[in-house]
Amino acid sequence: MITILTGPAAAGKNTIGHEYATRCCSQCSVIDGDAVRWMLRQPHRAPWDGEESLFQHRLGVKHACLLAKSFVSEGYEVVILDVVWADLAQVYRRELAEFSMKIVRIMPSWEASLDRLHNRPYTITDAQARWVYDTQKELKDFDLDIDNTARSVAEVSTWLDTINHKNP
């Protein structure tokens, strides 16, 4: 099983992904799409930096999928953390077509997302966060959607456990 968690900045993808992997799975790998893309050092482009950024993001998706395939072949469940936009869901679906896979959009309100962003170390501007939020709001290619504005990390992790292990 491969679960791709997408959502805006500060939606809780990392926290939820790690909680789910630790609490709900016997063997699980967490692949952070940001960490994969940061392997590209010169030049490194953020998603809002134009056409080159989409090329780099597609390359990051392909490498995240290579890692996912390797972990699945060793018997691990996989959680991929990424911001899926443009045609990236199609790239994930094509690259992982032979596996059971779900794209789950975690979508808090803009206000909750911004509040969470301001209560953690600085990473991106409010304008950049808004760009990411709007791309996630417009995203149509996902399998499941959850509004975690008022849900705890444990609640969302339990929900993921139910859809992946109890009602696959």
Question: Where are the regions that the model predicts?
Answer:
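Hydrophobic anchor at the beta1->P-loop junction of P-loop NTPases
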Residues: 5
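P-loop (Walker A) phosphate-binding loop of NTP-binding proteins
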Residues: 8
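ATP-binding Walker
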Residues: 11
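Walker A/P-loop
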Residues: 14
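Conserved substrate/cofactor phosphate-moiety recognition/catalytic segment
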Residues: 18-63
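Glycine-rich phosphate-binding loop used to anchor ATP phosphates in small-molecule kinases
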Residues: 55-98
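Conserved phosphate-donor/acceptor-positioning beta-strand/loop module used by diverse small-molecule
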Residues: 82, 97-117, 146
